[in-house]
Amino acid sequence: MSRDDLLSWIPAGHPDEMLVRQVNFERLPEHIAIIMDGNGRWAAQRHLPRVEGHRAGIDAVRDTVETAARLDIKVLTLFAFSIENWKRPATEISTLMMLLKRYLRSELKTLLTNNIKFRVIGRMDELADDIQDELRAAMDRTANDGGMLFNIALNYGGRAEIVDAARRAIESGIRAEDLDERRFATFLYTAGQPDPDLLIRTSGEMRVSNYLLWQIAYAEIYVTETLWPDFRRRHLLEAVLAYQKRERRYGGISIGQARAK
């Protein structure tokens, strides 16, 4: 999508217009991964139950998915529910699952309209049958969409993914001497996808929370104090602009450092 296409979606004179004009569409991250954090604090600041923070977070998901698709991001991965989240109160978990079902039903048309392919990464088979049915229906309906790939990490843990990948590698019969990093990556949930170029975490916390541990080896990390329910198009654009100001080295040295040698 071109800059003009994205600008046509933004009302004339809106502050986001200036941000879009600064974006270099030749240096966009292929894959953006986001840790959606801060729902509970958002609710607490407003003296509301935690579940209201999760409800408000749905609007942030909707805005972020559409913005990323219009930016022509190839892959967007959102961390929705971790393996560790099962430790939370049963009422909160049931609300999260209800909101997930509601989102899929209400937003499926938007996903199809924007040519977005929906996928789940994580131990989906451990979720309730009705949740699995909703997820599979959304994946089936969008399977042929050729636009942005939208991953939701559900019942997900980075260490669990690596363990699951190791098991699949063993089950495949691959010989130990034939297993290298490239081959091992084909057994991950994200096989065939580019690794995240940009990892965004909301709420100001400085940790990766067991998220995409293998894949974020060389990702640029951007942390914003913004709580997830308040995260909007502007915040995603700001993260992309910050990413574009960085020099990715992949363990090497910068051009300036090389010349100094």
Positions of predicted regions on the chain:
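Flexible, compositionally biased loop and terminal segments
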Residues: 1-261
